[in-house]
A protein has these predicted regions:
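C-terminal/domain-edge helix-coil "capping" segments
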Residues: 21, 40-56, 105, 112-121, ...
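N-terminal segment of the mature soluble domain
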Residues: 42-68, 127, 131-195, 295-307
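Sec-dependent signal peptide recognition
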Residues: 1-7
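Signal peptide-directed extracytoplasmic domains
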Residues: 62-135, 140-144, 160
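A short, hydrophobic beta-strand-centered structural micro-motif
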Residues: 74-87, 177-180, 193-226
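N-terminal signal peptide c-region/cleavage motif recognized by signal peptidases
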Residues: 12-14
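Extracytoplasmic
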Residues: 20-25, 74-76, 96-100, 124-130, ...
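Amphipathic beta-strand/beta-sheet edge segments enriched in Tyr/Trp
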Residues: 20-29, 102, 106-109, 206-253
């Protein structure tokens, strides 16, 4: 029965995980269509793709990656110009550019770069996260922010926060959801409990959403205008906590979430080997051609399997 146990271990790594597409594609802002702008755009796009594939933003600082960035065009399959979407984060497009460069990279070339540089890989079958975000406001008090949050206390800064969160998670290729904050959520988890980062309460409130991991984040604006906060996440039966402080609430989400994802993704990633290993898996009671096809499809979906 050992072969069956091996398969169970692989599939149970992330029960509710979702398949993520476009991991080898990046859209970046550029000032114009000149050759210099295209080269810089391709360089930026390669950084984005490597961060998205590895789950770690620090990889672009490695010497092996830096040398590859100098020849980023070697990894390109196709490029195209297009207008940037309105929801592009101010953090990603600080100069307010309107033109974007979409870069499609070669799967095999990028995979070889990752293997050669011994970088981690976050599989395309990725964990789905749920975010519990609570803001402490002088006038409105402590208040959870969800996907349907509206009302007078929902500020422009809150709206920007939601856009930034959505953009960062898309850039990182991580599926996520926000709670609906309906009556069931309100009865299960109060804003005060979320503010206290009460793990047991947050875990119970997250169960109905079928997420692989949860993230709780609290923040407030101090008297000097700076943003202060903390976050905690739970993944693979382990929890992690950290504090953060930023100058402004307009763009604090991208750096905070990127740091958080760097740590969380490590629980779901692996480092591919330079040499190929062979594992013989025996599957019993395959009684039809249809069953055989389904088994093949499931095996070939695994990042670790080549053939």
């Amino acid at each position: 029965m050992q072969p069956i146990l091996i398969l169970i271990m692989v599939w149970s790594h992330s029960i509710f995980a979702e398949e993520v597409d476009d991991l080898y594609i990046s859209l970046v802002p550029i000032p114009d269509q000149t050759l210099a702008s295209r080269h810089q755009g391709i360089n930026d796009a390669l950084k984005n793709v490597l961060v998205k594939l590895t789950g770690n933003s620090a990889v672009v600082q490695l010497a092996a990656v830096q040398s590859s960035l100098k020849n980023a065009t070697l990894y390109v399959d196709a490029i195209s110009f297009e207008a940037l979407p309105n929801n592009l984060s101010i953090y990603d497009n600080a100069e307010g550019l309107n033109l974007g460069l979409r870069v499609n990279f070669s799967h095999s070339a990028i995979d070889n770069l990752i293997r050669r540089s011994e970088l981690p890989v976050l599989p395309s079958n990725r964990p789905k996260l749920i975010f519990w975000i609570v803001r402490d406001d002088v006038e409105a008090g402590r208040r959870l922010l969800g996907k349907d949050t509206k009302g007078a206390s929902f500020t422009d800064a809150d709206e920007q926060l939601m856009r930034d969160l959505s953009r960062v998670m898309k850039d990182r290729g991580i599926p996520f959801i926000l709670p609906s904050l309906d009556l069931e959520d309100q009865l299960t988890l109060s804003a005060e409990e979320a503010w206290n980062l009460a793990s047991e309460k947050i875990e119970i409130a997250s169960e109905r959403y079928g997420a692989d991991a949860w993230v709780a984040m609290r923040f407030y604006r101090s008297s000097n205008g700076k943003i202060r906060g903390s976050w905690k996440y739970w993944a693979n039966n382990k929890s992690y906590f950290d504090d953060f402080g930023m100058e402004s609430d307009v763009s604090f989400i991208p750096p905070v979430i990127n740091e958080l994802i760097d740590g969380l993704a490590g629980s779901f990633s692996y480092v591919p080997q330079k040499t190929k290993n062979v594992l013989i898996v025996k599957v019993f009671d395959v009684q039809s051609l249809d069953n055989y096809k389904k088994i093949n499809e499931e095996l070939t979906r695994l990042e670790l399997v080549n053939s």
